């Protein structure tokens, strides 16, 4: 009987507290705001199309810009990171002053018009030059062997360095998980003899370093792999229309 009375008393206290809270809120002490219909066009913060961070002119309502960094740009010499040139090209100081935010994608292979690599020469040599040079439908370039254990180890170090440099001040709002495949989009044109993207166990080794390096940042994937759901990641697409 005592337990029943105690439970009833607790319920009564909760009801009275809720009623008092509602009375306080409805009396005008709460934080209320009434919006009016408008035909005005206004920006949607941190959403939608993001212009490149190197653009000189962006509209005032833009709050989000896009920055990609190739491994060749990031680490031209082993353990030496080219922060100054990266920040200058992407106008980092400007965007910080203007209160903008960035999307970051790390890329190891961007097809182009001429033969080239988007990983540094030292890494190419350290991994035994075991990737694939290609010249096909997408363009020309070099596709690393993403199963290479040395490549995976060095990738983890590079992501850690990115997190230590860019992951402390809130500038980066989104990470587009790149690293693998053409344009960092987790696919390759294997019909031209390029080694396929690795199986799940290896792919995940390219994901976990990002979770540790940028713990408070929204993360996006190009493909709906299982791990995206497990860690609450969104999806991105470079196309419109």
Region annotations inferred by a language model:
Residues 91-96, 100-102, 125-176, 200-213:
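An active-site-proximal structural segment forming one wall of the substrate-binding cleft
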Residues 14-24:
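Hydrophobic alpha-helical membrane-insertion segments, chiefly the h-region
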Residues 30-147:
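N-terminal substrate-binding region of glycoside hydrolase catalytic domains
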Residues 31-54, 61-66, 96-100, 174-183, ...:
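Catalytic-core regions of glycoside hydrolase
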Residues 69-73, 78, 106-110, 170, ...:
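Short, flexible loop/turn elements at secondary-structure junctions
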Residues 1-13:
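N-terminal Sec-pathway targeting helices
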Residues 23-29, 158:
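N-terminal membrane-anchoring alpha-helices
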């Amino acid at each position: 009987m005592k337990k029943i009375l105690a439970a009833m008393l607790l319920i009564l206290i909760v009801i009275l507290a809720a009623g008092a809270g509602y009375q306080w809120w409805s009396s005008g002490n709460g934080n209320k705001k009434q919006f009016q219909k408008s035909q005005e066009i206004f920006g949607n913060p941190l959403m939608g199309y993001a212009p490149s961070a190197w653009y000189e002119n962006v509209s005032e309502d833009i709050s989000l810009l896009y920055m990609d960094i190739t491994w060749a740009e990031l680490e031209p010499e082993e353990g030496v990171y080219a922060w100054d040139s990266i920040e200058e090209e992407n106008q980092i100081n400007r965007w910080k002053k203007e209160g903008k935010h960035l999307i970051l994608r790390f890329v190891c292979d961007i097809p182009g018009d001429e033969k080239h690599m988007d990983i540094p020469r030292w890494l190419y040599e350290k991994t035994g030059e075991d990737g694939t040079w290609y010249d096909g439908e997408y363009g020309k370039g070099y596709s690393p062997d993403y199963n290479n254990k040395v490549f995976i180890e060095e990738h983890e170090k590079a992501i850690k360095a990115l997190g230590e440099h860019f992951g402390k001040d809130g500038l980066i709002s989104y990470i587009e998980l790149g690293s693998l495949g053409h344009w960092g989009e987790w696919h390759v044109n294997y019909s031209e003899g390029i080694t396929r993207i690795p199986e799940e166990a290896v792919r995940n080794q390219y994901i976990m370093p990002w979770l540790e390096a940028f713990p408070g940042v929204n993360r996006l994937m190009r493909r709906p792999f299982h791990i995206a759901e497990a860690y609450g990641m969104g999806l991105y697409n470079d196309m419109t229309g």
